[in-house]
A protein has these predicted regions:
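Low-complexity, acidic/polar, glycine-enriched regions of mature
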Residues: 1-193
């Protein structure tokens, strides 16, 4: 059987543009005094990565992303003193950023379907390395191609205990963070030349 004249699917590489993207973590308080605590929103401003996308064969696509853990910062409307203290605890006691500076996600197991011209629903099953522990992390996203730009949106849960991380506690343990965090993203990536 001849393949002459058959169009070949082309994989296109995109570089993630952190400045045009948003990536956040929501943590939720629990415990006897949790009604008096707040549920912090944490911005992830410093990350980079690359997407390889084959629009005609999504399963041949891949993603690699590196987050600089020390860049995570609380964005809530709280006092500067509280912000510094929460950020310090997050970096020193939870993420231990001096020992584990990067959070990495690498995925080459992608499935999905085209839902409209240039729009896809995708499911990624990749390796998330956090706090020197690697686990399979599933992420569902809606991806859209627009000229030289790729945009992906979605959210997914991460359990701290899966990565051997103890949640922060306060007020003698009567307030602590729940084990499960919610990560939300609106990632833009530009086609590489």
């Amino acid at each position: 059987m001849s393949t002459v004249g058959t169009p070949q699917a082309i994989t296109v590489r995109y570089s993630i543009d952190a400045k045009r993207s948003t990536f956040t973590v929501r943590a939720f308080a629990t415990g006897m005094l949790s009604a008096f605590a707040h549920n912090p929103t944490i911005a992830i401003p410093d990350f980079q990565g690359e997407v390889s996308l084959n629009p005609d064969a999504v399963e041949q696509s891949s993603l690699r992303m590196v987050i600089h853990a020390a860049s995570l910062t609380v964005t809530d409307d709280i006092s500067e003193k509280d912000r510094r203290e929460i950020n310090r605890k997050m970096h020193e006691e939870v993420l231990e950023t001096d020992s584990f500076p990067d959070i990495e996600y690498e995925c080459s197991r992608v499935s999905g379907s085209k839902i409209a011209d240039g729009q896809y629903l995708v499911a990624l099953n990749g390796d998330l390395t956090l706090h020197a522990v690697t686990r399979i992390q599933s992420v569902s996203a809606r991806a859209r191609l627009n000229g030289d730009m790729l945009r992906a949106t979605g959210d997914f849960p991460v359990r701290l205990s899966d990565y051997e991380i103890r949640p922060i506690t306060a007020a003698g343990g009567t307030i602590k963070l729940k084990d499960e965090l919610k990560l939300s993203f609106d990632i833009s990536a530009r086609k590489q030349e």
